[in-house]
Amino acid sequence: LITSAEVVADYLRETRGLKVGVVDLVMFRPFPGDQLSRILKGKKGVVILERLDQPLATDLPIAREVRAVLSKCQENGITPLNMPYPELEMYRQGDTPSLYSGSYGMGSRDLQPEGIIGAVENMLPDGKHKKMFYLSIDFIRDMPYTPKQKIHQEAIQDAYPGIKELGIRGSENPNLMPKEAITVRFHSIGGWGAITTGKNLAMTLYDLLG
């Protein structure tokens, strides 16, 4: 995720002039709230992408932690002379960014530049501003493949109104790979020698391509 997000951020800065950046969270416990409170202060919007889904939870795990940090920073701003959380920044009005939460990779989907671009576009002034969304998933297809699929989709929409709007796609999917680079995708079943096969494949490609 991070390497892809960094490349997309560079692309959006160069082609659209957007002021976007990437924060790589490498530790979950103890949660680095003090560092995040400094990094996020004054930003307009923050999107947190997580490769999981918890439909019955208030927030996804990292989004929940970040929201708690922002809330504590706001509490510091209420009583600046006696901050209840001195290890965190003090947020005044306008310091708190809008928080967005995105789920990606569901159904073993690869995260393409299109998905990350969609997450950024969602936050822009003319974006959809969906607070919680799923990247690159068409819950309801605009053009069903078959009449049966159309009937099935209608049943889904009747049971879950608004489900179509949960999916977000970007307006483009640029090829941001380095020149002459190739990608290899390896599928396997657990317990069938996937690790050894993957290592052998990597060594073979290295010997062939250098």
Please annotate each region the language model reported:
Residues 176-180:
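Phosphate-binding P-loop
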Residues 50-166, 170-171, 190:
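Peripheral docking tails and interdomain loops at the edges
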Residues 25-33:
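Short acidic loop-to-helix transition motifs that present clustered carboxylates
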Residues 33-56:
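A structural-propensity feature for long, helix-poor, extended segments
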Residues 1-26, 182-210:
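Anionic-ligand anchoring segments at beta-strand to alpha-helix junctions in alpha/beta enzyme folds, i.e.
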Residues 3-6, 34, 64, 68:
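Feature representing long, continuous alpha-helical segments
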